[in-house]
Amino acid sequence: KFDAPLPSDFRPKIRDRYREAFATRLRAIPGVHDTITSLQAMLAVASGSSPEGLVQKLHQTGLSEYFGQHVYSSHQVERGKPAPDLFLFTAESLGVRPGACTVIEDSAKGIKAAVSANMRAIGFTGGGHCGPGHADSLLAEGANAVVKHMRDLRNVV
């Protein structure tokens, strides 16, 4: 039935399955470690995830070491993406002017936020959630370039 109410335990079960899947299946995007090492730049993470979720994801993928304390969540600002608040907060925290920042983003909302913050925006379509037309949606929001593989970031950053 399509009009049947959901069981009361539906949301908790979905949340638990989501957490279990992340805990057992989350892996770093191929090539990300080599790419980060080769960039020779000040790096930060600015994500819509919760602070706790960010720490868990970075630790599980082995990426924590690259960012140190420079991990920022939309929970730290008034408005999340597509507003520029998170990226502006990150730049300010790093002591860098927005125009000197480059954002690597896999979402159209994130590209829009980067453009609104007057930052260079590079779209990334190598994630499992990126299907046909995703690159076009990133370009439509103002991405300066779009790459599918992490190794290609070196050519556009």
Each model region followed by its residue ranges:
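Metal-dependent phosphoesterase signature
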Residues: 1-33
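Asp-based, Mg2+/Mn2+-dependent phosphohydrolase catalytic module
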Residues: 9, 33-37, 41, 50-157
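Conserved serine/cysteine hydrolase catalytic core
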Residues: 44
